[in-house]
Amino acid sequence: LHMIHLHWYQYPPMNPMMYPLLLVFMLITGILCLAGNFVTIWVFMNTKSLRTPANLLVVNLAMSDFLMMFTMFPPMMITCYYHTWTLGATFCEVYAFLGNLCGCASIWTMVFITFDRYNVIVKGVAGEPLSTKKASLWILTVWVLSFTWCVAPFFGWNRYVPEGNLTGCGTDYLSEDILSRSYLYIYSTWVYFLPLAITIYCYVFIIKAVAAHEKGMRDQAKKMGIKSLRNEEAQKTSAECRLAKIAMTTVALWFIAWTPYLLINWVGMFARSYLSPVYTIWGYVFAKANAVYNPIVYAIS
């Protein structure tokens, strides 16, 4: 109880119907996430043709999402059943740490996947091919930096506390001291604004490069006196259209997944009067759903 901010005491308990709904949602999300990411890991690791350096990043993404749901799914089911956090202060901190760690690792793995695609498509033969050693170094960098940022609250730079809905734990965005807020400013930049900017930048140039390539092929086809260098079926879905869809899907899903949690943190810092316990649910609902569709977007594309 000592970890719960006074702000939450002004609100009545949430509608009891919210907990069964949240429990069912988490049950479905947990099963889909664990199954989808396990299948992704198993297929990529057991299919020789798929064991490429680039796919090591996809496997790492699936691993981080799998670990996030594996460690957070059971506690959430328990707290939804009891309508409050019942697992103690220490486990609250561990729970929040693991969620932040896996979330941060997932985000930056997606960034490196995007950067690899940028390197292959935009730079082409001029770009340095991704080797197993380099991919492994990227993965190690992701986990070391994620761990460094997420362990900081244990040493006094911000802290992990129960969320307003009391079914989960996260960073403390209600404390007004400059030390706590400075962590959230930098962490928001590190796990949201910078990755989003890099992703958008890379995909803009990827689409431009593919569009230029397609135009070159059409011009070459005209010189050769044929309609297209592609067969009729491939022409129906041009490369730039498919890639544009992947790019828009990636950026849109990123925005949908992480923006609610960011907004909750920033509203908590600057306009807490608008923040009720019910609103805090949506942050991790969308973030957890991200772990479900990641294997679909990245493994297939």
Curated annotation (Swiss-Prot):
Keywords annotated in UniProt: Cell membrane, Cell projection, Chromophore, Disulfide bond, G-protein coupled receptor, Glycoprotein, Membrane, Phosphoprotein, Photoreceptor protein, Receptor, Retinal protein, Sensory transduction, Transducer, Transmembrane, Transmembrane helix, Vision
- Ubl conjugation as a keyword? no
User: Which Pfam families does its entry note?
Assistant: 7tm_1
N6-(retinylidene)lysine carried by residues: 288
Checking InterPro entries in the record gives: GPCR_opsins, GPCR_Rhodpsn, GPCR_Rhodpsn_7TM, Opsin, Opsin_lateye, Retinal_BS
Tell me which parts of the chain lie in the Cytoplasmic compartment: 44-55, 116-134, 205-245
Query: Transmembrane region positions?
Result: 19-43, 56-78, 93-115, 135-155, 183-204, 246-267, 279-300
Q: Which cysteines are joined by disulfide bonds?
A: 92-169
The yes or no answer to whether the keyword Disulfide bond is present is yes
Q: Report the family membership.
A: Belongs to the G-protein coupled receptor 1 family. Opsin subfamily.
Q: What is this protein called?
A: Rhodopsin
| Source organism of the structure | Lacunicambarus ludovicianus (Painted devil crayfish)
